[in-house]
């Protein structure tokens, strides 16, 4: 990943493997994959067929038998490797609580 992309991050990402389903809002197309890292503001998803950059998505994460769905957008892709997702900034307190619990559990 480039230094420029790293500089744009507001929250540190931590290694976290979770099942994920990415749903394209415009088409309903679904992609099942897994995350390799997670933060309060986004995640990286390992997939051979990343969704195009700028696509608006819903991200359904499952970790520790708990499910969380967040709105977001694909911010970059690495063909054959994966894609970076930025979550919408307006997380509900419940969504933020789940993310924080998962992130703290990885330390």
Regions found by a protein language model. Name each.
Residues 1-107:
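Structured alpha-helical
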């Amino acid at each position: 990943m480039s230094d420029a992309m790293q500089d744009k991050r507001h929250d540190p990402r931590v290694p976290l493997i979770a099942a994920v389903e990415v749903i394209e809002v415009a088409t309903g197309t679904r992609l099942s994959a897994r995350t390799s890292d997670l933060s309060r503001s986004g995640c990286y998803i390992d997939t051979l067929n990343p969704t195009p950059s700028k696509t608006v998505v819903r991200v359904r994460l499952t970790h520790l038998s708990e499910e969380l769905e967040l709105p977001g957008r694909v911010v970059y892709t690495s063909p054959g490797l994966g894609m970076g997702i930025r979550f919408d900034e307006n997380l509900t307190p419940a969504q933020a609580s789940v993310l924080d619990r998962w992130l703290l559990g990885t330390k």
